[in-house]
Amino acid sequence: MEKHAEPEKSLGDKEFQEKELHEKPAPAASEDISGDSSVNKEDGPDPINDNYLSGLRLAVVMFALCISNFLVALDTTILATAVPKISSDFNSLQDVGWYTSSYLLTNCAFQLFYGKLYTRFKVKIVFTVAMIIFEIGSLLCGVAPNSPVFIFGRAIAGLGSAGAFSGALIIVIHSVQAEKRAQYSGMIVGMYGLASVAAPLIGGAFTDHVTWRWCFYINLPCGGVAIAGLLFFFHSPPQAAVKETAAGLWAKIAKFDPFGTFFFLCSMICLLLALQMGGSTYPFTDARIIVLLVLFGLLLVAFIVVQFFDKNATIPPRVMKNRSVAFGMIYMFCVGAQFLVLVTFMPIWFQGVRAMSATDSGIRSLPILLSNTFCVVLAGALVSMTGYYIPFMWASVVLTSIGAGLLTTLTVDASTGKWVGYQIIAGIGGGLGYQQGISVAQTVLKGSDMTIGTAVMVFVQLLGGTILVSAANNILVTRLVENLERLAPHINPEIILRAGASGIKTAVSEADYPFVIEAYNIALTKTFQIALIVSCLGAIGAAGVEWKRGSKKGDSDEPAIMAV
């Protein structure tokens, strides 16, 4: 390597050494240590450009990103109030589970593939295509004449939504300085909490007063406005482009890690199918479920092996070997799991134990949703101001553990102060830590690795919620049956299961009702124990992340290592 002349300096010249430390360029994190020349060496240490957005351009781009992710998040939860009418129109009660799982399956399975696309193509192009796919899926759902077409539309919408969240966070990286990224990322993450609040109200209004199809039609004009705003006001920076040196069709295809992508997609499909059918359609001891779980394990191992030997790996080994990334993934898995478990089963507690309607249960779940949304945005602003994210990770672990633990103590006659206060504690904790794994990835990784790291964090957060909600649901059903056999042995559990949470009061006699809701309450508090356990396990992730300070206002983009 050619040596450059260094200016003369004395060993005691502390001022010069500090200046040199700050000015010395860091090696490109995206550079392949195996010598792969296909990676663009112009990626640099950080996707920094001289054209960060401000004023009207930044406002329009952020509005477009927030609207896009609000729609994607809304699509995940809006079905709760519309499913009864949809299943009635299609005469397809047996397909209800697939209305959500088909969306989650493609959303989860294609997260890492989008991460690869964002490193190979201009971010604006990939994000726009993802949103167009989401819009097409929404249109198919809106015009669906039967249940199979509706399920297909949900799968297409999930395929598009997979690239929306991580893509929005990557666009933020290219739009604002490093010290502002946590603040603006918090605005995008906050859209998921806002959508959780709005979904039951919007879904209920459309279903009751217009038609459930407008739950999906609404995505078309709003999504179109968001796409237009991004197309006209955001320009992908040069760093997003990759120099193409491959010759031949297969060489070009190989850039996208086809074998790794195949193994990963198939493993996720096997896992999600097992979770969807296990405990409901078939018992977990059924040979079909066991085969799916075994295939998931084998395919996942194959994916990991490919990542270590393929120079075009979807997740480069250097990313996975990074201590902060590895423990950050554990943390994000736990954060995603505890939050989704609580926001899924709190409305069921209100419907099943307190005999409230779907809309009323959604309103009474606002304490956890609003406190979570507020604290996501607040934490983003505070991380931008201070540069520190680990204190918020620990605050999240402590508060979510306390909140989930208190929720496990709920009784049938719990006072309003208890269920409101417990939700607020859990919501504050979840909000403070919800995006911190993303902050970790954007601090310890640089260049195209930052893009991959962001996609990985989003993926494990979604995967945690998907797996643990399924596990919690199976625990709910199992414990409910056990409790009914103990408290009301003369009642057929199948009657209660078919009635659902909102139909218990009409399914049993007035004399049996107190015993049934007691059984329901005990079973539901067991699901809150799942949230408590994963909240506590989040401490493992927080403890393993290196104590680094990201950029704060007034800093350069280079993070300062405070302690290891």
Curated annotation (Swiss-Prot):
Biased composition (Basic and acidic residues): 1-25
Record localization: Cell membrane
Keyword entries, A-Z: Cell membrane, Glycoprotein, Membrane, Transmembrane, Transmembrane helix, Transport
Domain of life, source organism: Eukaryota
Cellular component per GO, a single term: plasma membrane
Entries under InterPro entries matching the protein: MFS (IPR011701), MFS_dom (IPR020846), MFS_trans_sf (IPR036259)
GO molecular function: transmembrane transporter activity
Positions annotated as glycosylated: 312, 322
Residues annotated as transmembrane: 58-78, 96-118, 125-145, 156-176, 186-206, 214-234, 259-279, 289-309, 330-350, 361-383, 395-415, 452-472
Topological category with respect to the lipid bilayer: Multi-pass membrane protein
Disordered, as annotated region: 1-46
Pfam entry (one): MFS_1
CDD domains on file: MFS_Azr1_MDR_like
Keyword Membrane among record annotations: yes
Family classification: Belongs to the major facilitator superfamily. TCR/Tet family.
Purpose: Efflux pump that might be required for efficient secretion of hypothemycin or other secondary metabolies produced by the hypothemycin gene cluster.
Designated name of the protein: Efflux pump hmp6
Native source organism of the sequence: Hypomyces subiculosus (Nectria subiculosa)
